[in-house]
């Protein structure tokens, strides 16, 4: 299998399967001299960790990360810093229940990658989905923690803004609420509703989808490049690569098709020292594939978890029709734990774009230009 890496100068390769002994990643291209200890990574892994409440899979994984390489003691400070060499990160799997999959190992689960893995490779790890499992995303979160060290001045935050057909009230958006509820929801009233709503979905043995919004603030103007290195296209590709994601939009996204030209284009005024002030942010902080200095805003849609307790029709690998009930421990809304994953992927893209920008233009052009 190929295509397990992403990024250019900041490059991440993930490895491991859902029920294997461990998962992890190798981060290459991280500059030397950045303080990095396991606690810097663990804080983000803990936000994604399963089994924390009844709205997540009850698989109990500690997700304790180990840094295997790429760091050393700084002779001046005595602290641990990056060396500029590949950083290997390991997360052990400790709570696999492969027996849950024995009875259906030959049956293709509807909505899962079982059939296409067989069609492409002729062999697959049926235990928990193997490589296609969302378990792999823990490695991305670990890599994202390293990326944040490179772009420490950029604040990257995510939130769940829709569950099923129910959207939050954006007038009540409060970032302080995000880590106060199990849904990463910025609207306290919506979070209370989601609790009752998802309880009903869960008890019915079903699942539901969600929409996640990621906002990156303090990224300067100039990151990204035309034509095939566009910042928004790389963010979209990174978010689209997350398990169960079926759609991505930047800024107004598809809603821009409903606007007129005068409504959609973000007007500008002159601020301090001629620096532009944007009167709106329909573009989501990106124009022509290059950051504008405004908040970078991306949203992605996560489909309902395909593993549900209700019986469904399928076929097995021999072509025989079969009814399947998927047992095991699954998220009733996998979109919830996609929030820290989305943050991590945006962090990786921005770190990569920063390094590429620095490599191409150094500190950047002197702006504003003299009259």
Swiss-Prot record:
GO terms for molecular function: chorismate synthase activity; FMN binding. It comes from Methylocella silvestris (strain DSM 15510 / CIP 108128 / LMG 27833 / NCIMB 13906 / BL2). Transmembrane segments: none annotated. NADP(+) binds at residues 48, 54. Its EC number is 4.2.3.5. This is Chorismate synthase. GO terms for biological process: amino acid biosynthetic process; aromatic amino acid family biosynthetic process; chorismate biosynthetic process. Homotetramer. Keywords: Amino-acid biosynthesis, Aromatic amino acid biosynthesis, FAD, Flavoprotein, FMN, Lyase, NADP.
């Amino acid at each position: 299998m190929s295509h397990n890496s992403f990024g250019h100068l900041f490059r991440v390769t993930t490895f491991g399967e859902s029920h294997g002994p461990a998962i992890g990643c190798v981060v290459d291209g991280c500059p030397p001299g950045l303080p990095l200890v396991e606690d810097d990574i663990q804080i983000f892994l803990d936000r994604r960790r399963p089994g924390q409440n009844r709205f997540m899979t009850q698989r109990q994984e500690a997700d304790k990360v180990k840094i295997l390489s790429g760091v050393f003691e700084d002779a001046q400070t005595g602290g641990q810093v990056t060396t500029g060499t590949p950083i290997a990160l390991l997360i052990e799997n400790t709570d696999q229940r492969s027996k849950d999959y024995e009875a259906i190992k030959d049956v293709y689960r509807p909505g899962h990658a079982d059939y296409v893995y067989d069609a492409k490779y002729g062999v697959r790890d049926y235990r928990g989905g193997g490589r296609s499992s969302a378990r792999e995303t823990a490695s991305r979160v670990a890599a994202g923690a390293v990326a944040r060290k490179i772009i420490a001045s950029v604040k990257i935050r995510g939130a769940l803004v829709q569950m099923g057909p129910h959207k939050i009230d954006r007038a009540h958006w409060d970032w302080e609420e995000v880590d106060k509820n199990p849904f990463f929801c910025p609207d306290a009233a919506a979070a209370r509703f989601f609790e009752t709503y998802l309880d009903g979905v869960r008890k019915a043995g079903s699942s539901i989808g969600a929409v996640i919004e990621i906002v990156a603030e303090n990224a300067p103007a100039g990151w990204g490049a035309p034509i095939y290195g566009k910042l928004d296209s790389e963010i979209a590709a990174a978010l689209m690569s997350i398990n169960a994601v079926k759609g991505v939009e930047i800024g107004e996204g598809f809603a821009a098709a409903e606007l007129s030209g005068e409504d959609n284009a973000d007007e500008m005024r002159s601020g301090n020292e001629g620096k532009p002030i944007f009167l709106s942010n329909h573009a989501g902080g990106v124009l022509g594939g290059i950051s504008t200095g405004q908040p970078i805003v991306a949203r992605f849609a996560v489909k309902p978890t395909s593993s549900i307790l209700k019986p469904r029709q399928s076929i097995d690998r021999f072509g025989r029709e079969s009814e399947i009930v998927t047992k095991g421990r699954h998220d009733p809304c996998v979109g919830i734990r996609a929030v820290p994953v989305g943050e991590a992927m945006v962090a990786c893209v921005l770190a990569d774009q920063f390094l590429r920008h620095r490599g191409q233009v150094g500190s950047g052009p002197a702006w504003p230009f003299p009259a």
